[in-house]
UniProtKB/Swiss-Prot annotation:
This is Large ribosomal subunit protein bL12. The gene is rplL. One of its GO terms (cellular component) is cytosolic large ribosomal subunit. PANTHER family: 39S RIBOSOMAL PROTEIN L12, LARGE RIBOSOMAL SUBUNIT PROTEIN BL12M. GO terms for molecular function: mRNA binding; structural constituent of ribosome. InterPro entries: Ribosomal_bL12, Ribosomal_bL12_C, Ribosomal_bL12_C/ClpS-like, Ribosomal_bL12_oligo, Ribosomal_bL12_oligo_N_sf. The keyword Ribonucleoprotein applies.
Length: 128
């Protein structure tokens, strides 16, 4: 097999959808027995253990959790697609599988904006 340069790999990744890229990352993690999120989790855990007083400060990253779609499921699916760039099937599966996170680790203002949009479409949403 020919060896690919870093630029060639990046060009190939640019052509993938987010779902395809996510599947690639999962396979990569399984094949090489690694976790893409490990360095971030270790750094966050070390920071939290070193300064427990800072934990009382306001949280800076939020997860937007869709609790239920309510009566207007189609409108909620449209909003989920707009917020996440998911395809129709993926957005429908996310809405049908509620409660599920729509957005993870986003800034407070982005989380509140997403919550307002989803609630405007008829969904029940919580921020964590």
């Amino acid at each position: 097999m020919a060896k690919l340069s870093t630029d060639e790999l990046l060009d190939a990744f640019k052509e993938l959808t987010l779902i395809e890229l996510s599947e690639f990352v999962k396979k990569f993690e399984e094949t090489f027995d690694v976790t893409a999120a490990a360095p971030v989790a270790v750094a966050a855990a070390g920071g939290a253990a070193g300064a427990p007083a800072e934990a009382a400060e306001e949280q800076s990253e939020f997860d937007v959790i869709l609790e239920s779609a309510g009566d207007k499921k189609i409108g909620v699916i449209k909003e989920v697609r707009a917020l996440t760039s998911l395809g129709l099937k993926e957005a429908k599966d996310l809405v049908d599988g509620a409660p599920k996170p729509v957005l993870e680790k986003v800034a407070k203002d982005a989380a509140e904006k997403a919550k307002a949009q989803l609630e405007g479409a008829g969904a029940t949403v919580t921020l964590k």
